[in-house]
């Protein structure tokens, strides 16, 4: 997908990571939506991940709503990670605890 305002070069599109965690916040904002996810590590510590989505307009056309995920929801997120190794990425897909999948990139 071409983007008029910036590239997605910050993300490693050759990798897809899977993160299971609890939604801390979902920001339904322009120019991009953001999902803040708290992930539990095997040692019991937590990491907060910032996952960038497309615009509300694009996500809305894909079935998203501002309350598609809410704080406290347990979700699995598939993401292209940041190339820097920081805890962030580009959302590809979100799977709710009930197994419902919500795509985050147009097909």
PLM feature segments, named:
Residues 3-17:
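Short boundary/loop segments of OB/S1/cold-shock single-stranded nucleic-acid-binding domains
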Residues 82-105:
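OB-fold/S1-family single-stranded nucleic acid-binding modules
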Residues 42-54:
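A short macromolecule-binding patch
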Residues 61-76:
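Short nucleic-acid-contacting surface segments enriched for D/E, G, S/T with interspersed K/R
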Residues 29-40:
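Short aromatic-glycine-enriched beta-strand elements
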Residues 21-23:
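Conserved hydrophobic positions within beta-strands
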Residues 53-61:
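Short, structured beta-strand/loop micro-motifs enriched in basic residues and often containing a Trp
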């Amino acid at each position: 997908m071409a983007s008029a305002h910036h590239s997605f070069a910050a993300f490693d599109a050759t990798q897809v990571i899977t993160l299971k965690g609890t939604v801390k916040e979902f920001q339904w904002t322009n120019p991009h939506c953001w999902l803040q996810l708290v992930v539990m590590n095997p040692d019991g510590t937590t990491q907060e991940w910032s996952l960038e989505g497309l615009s509300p307009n694009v996500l809305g056309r894909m079935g998203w709503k501002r309350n598609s995920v809410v704080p406290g929801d347990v979700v699995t997120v598939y993401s292209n990670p940041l190339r820097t190794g920081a805890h962030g990425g580009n959302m590809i897909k979100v799977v709710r605890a009930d197994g419902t999948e919500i795509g985050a990139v147009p097909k």
